Design a protein with these regions (language model features):
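Short, low-structural-confidence N-terminal segments
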Residues: 1-89
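P-loop NTPase catalytic cores that bind/hydrolyze ATP
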Residues: 101
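Charged, solvent-exposed helices and adjacent loops that form client-binding or oligomerization surfaces
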Residues: 64-96, 112-164
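Residues at structural and domain junctions
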Residues: 5, 42, 96-97, 112
Length: 164
């Protein structure tokens, strides 16, 4: 438990590295190297469900990119240390990433407790969506590269899609 708390503290302190750092094959790059946290290591537990660190990292990266794009579109310089209500922009994106991570774990818990599982129709819809996305990206290799930029691969994308 102490190791998890230490890892979480380290991960949260390295947010800006995740928001602007270099990349590896899955898009996490410097953040994972600096934190030393394995992608599959349980980062937190939500109502008994262990949540791997890659999920938090995905939502953190997505939040950073979304905020970066909003500032770019508005023609504003992005300062992660800029004060906002409750802290800084970096604090805001960390809080949102944690909230999204917890939300998805909560939905999974609810689905499990109510016996909701993906059926053949759901899986067929996911396959059709995959085909559409790969075509939109110019092929599967290009789509897989785009997913890697988000810290995902096909299995992880399908895992998140199956929840949402």
């Amino acid at each position: 438990m102490k190791r998890r708390v230490t890892a979480l503290a380290l991960m949260l302190s390295l947010t800006l590295t995740a928001c602007g750092g270099g990349e590896d094959g899955r898009g996490q790059g410097l953040f994972q190297k600096a934190s030393g946290v394995e992608e599959e290591a349980a980062l937190l537990t939500v109502d008994g469900r262990e949540v791997p660190s890659w999920r938090y990292l995905y939502w953190l990266r997505r939040g950073c990119e979304r905020l970066r794009e909003q500032y770019r579109a508005a023609g504003l310089p992005l300062d992660w240390n800029a004060p906002v209500e409750g802290g800084t922009l970096a604090d805001y994106v960390k809080d949102q990433a944690l909230a999204d991570t917890v939300l998805y774990a909560t939905v999974e818990n609810w689905a499990d407790s109510h016996g909701c599982v993906l059926d053949e129709e759901d899986r067929a819809a996911m396959d059709a969506a995959w085909a559409e996305r790969t075509a939109a990206h110019g092929g599967e290799a290009a789509y897989l590269r785009a997913l890697a930029d988000m810290g995902l691969d096909r299995a992880r994308m399908e895992e998140l899609t199956g929840v949402g």
